Amino acid sequence: MIKKNKNDLNEMEYLVTQENGTEPPFQNEYWNHFEKGIYVDKISGKPLFTSEEKFESDCGWPSFSKALADEEIVELVDKTFGMVRTEVRSEDANSHLGHVFNDGPKESGGLRYCINSAAVQFIPYEKLEELGYGDLIPHFEK
């Protein structure tokens, strides 16, 4: 399982995960990334999303229609910047991940998890077993 110590985070990773920051749209690692695999919490290594639920949303950040496991996600009311939004945090590491909105694909439940690339690490499908995520392989065989 991939894990990262909070002290080893780069400036953007720290800003996003620990200070509730947001990385620039269209200038982040995974906004236009559609390789088969999973996205794990940058700090805890817990699986959060899969490429199977990722979709193009034109917002500039990775977007997913649902989380891999609801128990790994915490949703909180966010009233910053004069808006009311739903913040998404990881349960285990308490990392700020992004926000969830009700404007996702209707056929997939209508949600759009808008996630900062700096908060997650991508694990390619081919490396799932090797890196300790082999139990997720059946998720891709549906």
Swiss-Prot record:
Xref: Pfam families: SelR (PF01641)
Domain of life: Bacteria
Protein name per the record: Peptide methionine sulfoxide reductase MsrB
GO molecular function: peptide-methionine (R)-S-oxide reductase activity
Catalyses which reaction(s): L-methionyl-[protein] + [thioredoxin]-disulfide + H2O = L-methionyl-(R)-S-oxide-[protein] + [thioredoxin]-dithiol
One annotated Gene Ontology cellular component of this protein: cytoplasm
Active site feature: C114 (nucleophile)
GO BP field: protein repair; response to oxidative stress
Sequence similarity: Belongs to the MsrB Met sulfoxide reductase family.
Keyword Oxidoreductase: yes
Matching InterPro entries: Met_Sox_Rdtase_MsrB, Met_Sox_Rdtase_MsrB_dom, Mss4-like_sf
MsrB domain residues: 2-125
